[in-house]
Each structure stands twice: as C-alpha cells, then as structure tokens.
Amino acid sequence: MRIRVFGAAIAALAMAAGAQAAFELPCKAGDRPCFIQAMRAHPARSAAFWKPSLSRPVTERLGPAPAELVEFLHLDNAANGFPEKPRASRLSADFMADVRGAIADLPPAVRRAFDATFAGVWFVDDLGGTGFTDMYSDASGNPVGGFIVLDAAVLGKFTANAWATWKENTPFKPAKAWKLEARIEGAATDDRRGAIRYILLHELGHVLSINRGVHPRWDIPPAEVPATARFPFFDLSWTIDRKGDRYASIFDAGFTAVRGGRFLKC
C-alpha cells in the first residue's frame, strides 16, 4: 500500500490550516487490516516527520493540525469504524490563551512530560472524541515519542463540569427517571481552561506510558505482544487473551454487563 508523502513543512501547514485537503482513503470501507497497515506506514508515525516541530520550544508545539496528521486521523477513524472526518481547527486567540494557561496550570512533575520527545498538542474539529494520543517511531520502528490531538470544537463549547457530564453520559440512553452529573472542578475553575487542563492530563498519561513498560504497545494486536514482556501495572487489571487476540479484564466475571458496552472514546 503506497501512502503519499507530503513535502510541506509543519509550520507552513499550520499557517494554512484554513485550506482543508480532501483525503482519498487508500482502503475499502471496513478493511481494517489495510487501514492498520496504512497507518503504520504513514509519515505522521515517523520521527522524521516531527523533527521540525521538535526543534521548536515546547510552547510553540501547539496549533492547528498539519495536513499529514489530519490524513492520519482519517485513517484511524476509518480503521475503527468512526464516521467523523477531522479537519484542522481555526483557533481564536482566546482559545489558545486558555490552552497555554491550562498547560501552565499543570504541576511541574507533569509538565516534564513536555520534553524533547513530545511532538506537541494539535487541534482539529470533528475528531470523533475529545482527545487522541499516538506514538511516533524511529527508522527501526521503535517508539520514541508521542503527540496529542484535541478537538477544539468540542472543548470550545464546554466548561469543565459540563464537559465531564457530557462525557460520562455518552454510554447511556437518556431517561427521565435518572440524571448523571459529573464535577471535576470547583466553581472558581469551572471554565473552558479547566476542561482543557483535565483532558490534557488524561492524554499526557498516554504519552508518559510510551517506552515505560506500563502496558503493551497499543499499535500491535494483543496476540503479537511478546510472551516474555512484563507489565506489572497492566497486570493489576488485565490479561492477554492470545487465542482471542484481545485484552480481557480480570474483573469480567464480576461485571458481565460491562463487556456488552463501549464506555470510552476520549
């Protein structure tokens, strides 16, 4: 499968975020193996692609998603059966001020995740969720860093508690008999900046897991996880069903209804 490689620099692409490209998917609808192969070969998964971004200060690794990254997200959504077609965001100055403020709010130990291997926080609309994290690899295919994508259209319309309430309600059908509300911030910080800060913390957890033995790589099938690999934190809650090529919760027997639902797409 040949994936087209773009030559434009990240900075130029970010400045031209208003011009949205039309992406032609390289695989037939529903052909997940084809999409997975295309994603693995995509420039956005390579360290070389992120080199221009990594050469800039961490505070400048923010902005509308470059075209290659948007294309990669189209592939990921198609591989997972999501209908959304992401497009680069047009970001207002006040929104970006909230993003920078949310990053500044993070504890120093967390901000250290924004290191030399962190390729930045990039924004799209119509992601199909609020946040997305993936890794990029060196020429030998070894993961060496990560990047985050956030949906600016979603974050732009919610305060922290409103976003959390919306997210917690997504697995359930509305009913007059009950109501679910979530509170993640006090009244003084229940704003858009608080929502951005919360989802950044979540996605940074994924970034921090790269190359740290927290859990198996998410870009390989469970059946292909090396049998000799050890993941002490992962083992507290999960096992690898190699025959079924899936991860199985050790709590499945006690919560049989959980396997019938889909509870989270960040």
What is each PLM-predicted segment?
Residues 158-163, 209-218:
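Short, solvent-exposed secondary-structure capping/transition elements
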Residues 178-200:
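Short pre-active-site segment immediately N-terminal to the catalytic Zn-binding motif
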Residues 96-106, 193-205:
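Short, hydrophobic/amphipathic alpha-helical packing segments
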Residues 93-175:
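Auxiliary, metal-adjacent structural segments of Zn-dependent hydrolase domains
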Residues 212-266:
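Post-HExxH zinc-binding segment in Zn-dependent metallohydrolases
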Residues 150, 198-214:
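Active-site recognition of the HExxH zinc-binding catalytic motif
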Residues 2-10, 18-123, 215-220:
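N-terminal low-structure segments adjacent to metalloprotease catalytic domains
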